[in-house]
Amino acid sequence: AGEPKLDAGV
C-alpha cells in the first residue's frame, strides 16, 4: 500500500 513496512511486514 505504498508502505514497505506494512506492505510485507518487513
From Swiss-Prot:
Keywords: Amidation
Role, per record: Antidiuretic peptide that triggers the release of ADH.
GO BP of this protein: vasopressin secretion
Sequence positions bearing Valine amide: V10
Name of protein: Pneumadin
Domain of life assignment: Eukaryota
